[in-house]
């Protein structure tokens, strides 16, 4: 891939600024954990796996900022760093998974000198980034087998390299199918209100030379009914124990349309996106974002001033609409409760 979503470089976190794509390919450097938290909150970086990596690197930066004479003081301040990162975005479980992993590593190394502990945390954050890239490639390999030769694949939002450490989940499946020689093409929903499909997915696929057609969100049913879409592949921000899946707002609508038109609807996500502590999707917290994201487009008003707005960032697709969940460990379908639990069994 010709871009890097996020990396640790010279004791700084470097991210591509996704708010400025596709017009400008700009990389931003962050030297402190609070600025990383703000980048996550402001969607400079987004996508569940990517913000998990960003959170881990933010914690590592925070550990380097802490001034402490005792372990008690260090770990007290570390807890505050982790709390700041955890409050950035509530829906994507990878964020919390990464923070908990960093806290666990810190706790396991309490006997080390503080300078060594800081280096251990940096190494762990980089390891999380590297692992995510490998997970995505494995997801791609498993999912590519589900994509028919010559298929037109519909995807929603951006679950590509920009949403992960690289390669992508849903787009990882598409990339792997393309690399395997299947002559596929992609329909990308524009994905209002942030236009991740138009700005990010279309940009990624065009860079890779994968044929892509942009459609507005309300066109999906039209093309499904005409038989122009063979299957749908989306990513996920949190998957409950029964397979209910939170993903970008509008995913549920696409899944219902796919079911009505007998089109397979696949979810691609690493096992780090599973939250088996939640029985079903009703328990998944849904982030609501600022009304301006709906009323303005690139700073220009597109709605009357003072209009009431609702802006949930995610919705939950019930498991009954999902044909299969593609993970780095394999594909699960049917009995999600048993299948998903089997993926993470010790």
Curated annotation (Swiss-Prot):
Q: What does the record give as the active site?
A: 237
Outline what the protein does: Catalyzes the interconversion of methylthioribose-1-phosphate (MTR-1-P) into methylthioribulose-1-phosphate (MTRu-1-P).
User: What GO terms in the biological process aspect are recorded for it?
Assistant: L-methionine salvage from methylthioadenosine
Q: Name one Pfam family in it.
A: IF-2B
Listed binding positions for substrate are 46-48, 89, 196, 247-248
From which residue to which does the signal peptide run? none
GO MF annotations, alphabetized: S-methyl-5-thioribose-1-phosphate isomerase activity
What are the protein's UniProt keywords? Amino-acid biosynthesis, Isomerase, Methionine biosynthesis
Its EC top class is isomerase
**From which organism does this entry originate?**
Geobacter sulfurreducens (strain ATCC 51573 / DSM 12127 / PCA)
InterPro entries the record matches: IF-2B-related (IPR000649), IF-M1Pi (IPR005251), IF_2B-like_C (IPR042529), Initiation_fac_2B_a/b/d (IPR011559), M1Pi_N (IPR027363), NagB/RpiA_transferase-like (IPR037171)
Which reaction(s) are listed as its catalytic activity?
5-(methylsulfanyl)-alpha-D-ribose 1-phosphate = 5-(methylsulfanyl)-D-ribulose 1-phosphate
Question: What's the protein called, per UniProt?
Answer: Methylthioribose-1-phosphate isomerase
Q: Which domain of life is it from?
A: Bacteria
| Site location (Transition state stabilizer) | 157
Membrane-spanning segments? none
Q: State the similarity comment.
A: Belongs to the eIF-2B alpha/beta/delta subunits family. MtnA subfamily.
């Amino acid at each position: 891939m010709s871009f890097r979503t996020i990396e640790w470089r010279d004791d700084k976190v470097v991210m591509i600024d996704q708010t400025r794509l596709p017009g400008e390919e700009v990389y931003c450097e962050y030297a402190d954990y609070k600025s990383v938290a703000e980048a996550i909150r402001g969607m400079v970086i987004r996508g569940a796996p990517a913000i998990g990596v960003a959170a881990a690197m933010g914690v590592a930066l925070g550990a380097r900022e802490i001034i402490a004479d005792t372990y008690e003081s260090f770990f007290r301040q570390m807890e505050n760093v982790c709390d700041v990162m955890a409050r950035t975005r509530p829906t994507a479980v990878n964020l919390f998974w990464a923070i908990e992993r960093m806290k666990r590593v810190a706790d396991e190394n309490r006997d080390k000198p503080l300078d060594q502990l800081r280096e251990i945390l940096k190494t762990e954050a980089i390891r999380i980034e590297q692992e995510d890239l490998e997970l995505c490639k494995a997801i791609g390999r498993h999912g590519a087998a589900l994509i028919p030769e010559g298929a037109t694949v519909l995807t929603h939002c951006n679950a590509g390299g920009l949403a992960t450490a690289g390669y992508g989940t849903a787009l990882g499946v598409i990339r792997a199918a393309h690399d395997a020689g299947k002559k596929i093409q992609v329909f990308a929903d524009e994905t209002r209100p942030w236009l991740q499909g138009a700005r990010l997915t279309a940009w990624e696929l065009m860079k890779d030379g994968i044929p892509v057609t942009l459609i507005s969100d309300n066109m999906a049913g039209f093309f499904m009914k005409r038989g122009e879409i063979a299957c749908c592949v989306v990513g996920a921000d949190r998957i409950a124990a029964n397979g209910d899946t939170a993903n970008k707002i509008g995913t549920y609508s696409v899944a219902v349309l796919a079911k009505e038109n007998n089109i397979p609807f696949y979810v691609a996500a690493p096992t780090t996106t599973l939250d088996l502590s939640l029985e079903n999707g009703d328990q998944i917290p849904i982030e609501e974002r600022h009304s301006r994201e709906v009323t303005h487009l690139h700073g220009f008003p597109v709605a009357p001033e003072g209009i009431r707005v609702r802006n949930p960032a995610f919705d939950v697709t019930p498991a009954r609409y999902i044909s299969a969940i593609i993970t780095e460990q394999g594909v699960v379908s049917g009995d999600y409760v048993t299948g998903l639990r089997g993926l993470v069994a010790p």
